[in-house]
């Protein structure tokens, strides 16, 4: 019987999802992206060879895996073609392994222009977007004026709709932001060659996944970003423009929620965040710099340095509840090697002196909380590359056990290095049929 699992980030993104998805795809027939866009950056390392993906699912390097980009993903066609060609130069037959939903909203030049002009206008209050047009593209989708991938294949209708939408957005660009307009003809000329390349990959994703499930194939749904960047449940407004929680598998891939067997939350052994927004356990000190440097905490998409801090069990518990996580995968355990003391945030303290074990909702409430830490002994021994739980230092095992106690969820996978082989699998998601 086939199993259907979801892999998603339980923090603010950059948890190491790409490596874990790449590892688990050995057992998956289909790997599906269901939200986000090319603002994601998933890094895969196998036998020392590094591959960075932004749009294409992380199963693309596997010979027998079919990779799908679902309708919940906003698609920048030029970025997709670039990624396809880069992989093909490495000998990966992408066009034989990749399928696309006809319902994917397109990211077009006016979305990028709006994204950048808005960030400029915000000044010191900038959200810290990647500037790739993700938010404006989702806005058009909700406003029912988006051009979708399937629209590309009817030239007359597409050009008519495109002209109308460009006029709409140019009014804002020119008259509000005092910026240059986007030229209709240039957009048209740049898009038509791409339509021919992508046409044979376009499918009805819901039907393909339904047939795969009926054939008892293993399906893996790959999330982008992280739980606390969710447009509804994240640290709003410092969030992305899509739903990053497990529920978006249903809306972003057309796959019924009752068919999901296991949901794996990826969590670093510490915390990181890119860009502005609340981060209660942030460390602006020597320890923070240690975590950043040793963990190579620089974005795969933007190259920006990440903010670093201790593991936050308060937000992690919230992520477990929102996503109904079956188990956790703890990544970058090896980064904590050598620290005399490691800390976990177990509660928040408000400015009025009261304590809470819940995450705030508003920005004002987030600004008022401070972390209450529990300190545990660190370990001097190296955990890098360890593949057996029995080889881990006892203090590292105690740290993992304490995380399990604080969250009520087992740590099923431990990552001790960037390569897919540098992993301890205690319970394989495809071996379990757990529903919560």
Swiss-Prot record:
One of its GO terms (cellular component) is cytoplasm. Belongs to the adenylosuccinate synthetase family. Its cofactor is Mg(2+). PANTHER family: ADENYLOSUCCINATE SYNTHETASE. GO terms for biological process: 'de novo' AMP biosynthetic process; IMP metabolic process. Homodimer. The lineage of its organism: Bacteria, Pseudomonadati, Pseudomonadota, Gammaproteobacteria, Enterobacterales. It is found in: Cytoplasm. It comes from Hamiltonella defensa subsp. Acyrthosiphon pisum (strain 5AT). GTP binds at residues 13-19, 41-43, 306, 332-334, 415-417. This is Adenylosuccinate synthetase. Substrate binds at residues 300-306. SUPFAM superfamilies: P-loop containing nucleoside triphosphate hydrolases (SSF52540). PROSITE patterns: ADENYLOSUCCIN_SYN_1 (PS01266), ADENYLOSUCCIN_SYN_2 (PS00513). It catalyses: IMP + L-aspartate + GTP = N(6)-(1,2-dicarboxyethyl)-AMP + GDP + phosphate + 2 H(+). Pathway: Purine metabolism; AMP biosynthesis via de novo pathway; AMP from IMP: step 1/2.
